[in-house]
Amino acid sequence: MDKYGNTEWENSYSLGAFGNGRSVIQTQDGGYLYAGWKGIVKADANGIEEWKNTSRQNGAYPYYEDVMQHSNGFYYAVGGPGAGQAQLVKFNETGNVLTRKWYGGQCEDDIFRSIIETPDEMLLIVGEKTHGNQSYSCAFNFMYYKDIWIVKTRTNGGVEWEKTHGGPYMEMANDIAPIRSGGYMLIGNKCDHLYDIGSCSQKAKVLIMQIDEEGNNLNQEVIPGLKWMERIPYYSITTTNDGYAWAAEHKNNGTWIYQVIPNTDPSYIYTDGFGGFEINHTTDGGFIIGTMDGLIIKTDSELLY
């Protein structure tokens, strides 16, 4: 679409009934790359499909959650779980798999959710790592016993370092964005369910964390009101010149867009749609938000639309 929201072209790409699109990016050649639970699809600048890759190794599907193109020209997709592990897959520009690496897996359901390139041209990945509960080293209700998981790798997938942040219950990271002055902001969710996992529908909160270049927690904030969905988190964060903004779904009020600028009170709005599948800072200083039901919202810098 153009900058006014008018459709320039549209196309559809089949990844089967369980495709469940999770990420789309514009590539260096002006085309687009789409990633979902069953694979990835590359299209040209006019939306014409160029190639598709649905290969997998562990599990029924590759379960991609995010994809990026590195400055080296290669594509990197992350996701999981496959046999309990998270994965990082490196593709060349024609869609062939060059490297597939697996991480975690001590307990079931380790997942990578988001990937970005670091200033030193490595990869930084965030997601969720499963741990035990009060009775077992690996909890049976594994989706409710998680830590925020941050992994830095080289471009071949070799681990530089990894960190986890969390307590005895549930903390997850879903998206990460760089800060201009250094470090990163990430968004996730937190539920102190006190071993009553059914209470997360009322107790789930948005978790915002600032980390440094080594993944250390510098600051965090939790905001109540998040609508909790068990398997498909749909919240996203973007940074601005002097702050950040995020989008999620409020449990009572639809799409929830929230902006933080230092030394001012936070501003937020509730609007139509289901959640903040993706939020990006636009060149005019505003924001564009994609929701889970396909609604696209464009705001100005003050969240007016």
Language-model segments: what does each one mean?
Residues 1-305:
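A sequence-level/structural motif corresponding to short, flexible coil/turn segments enriched
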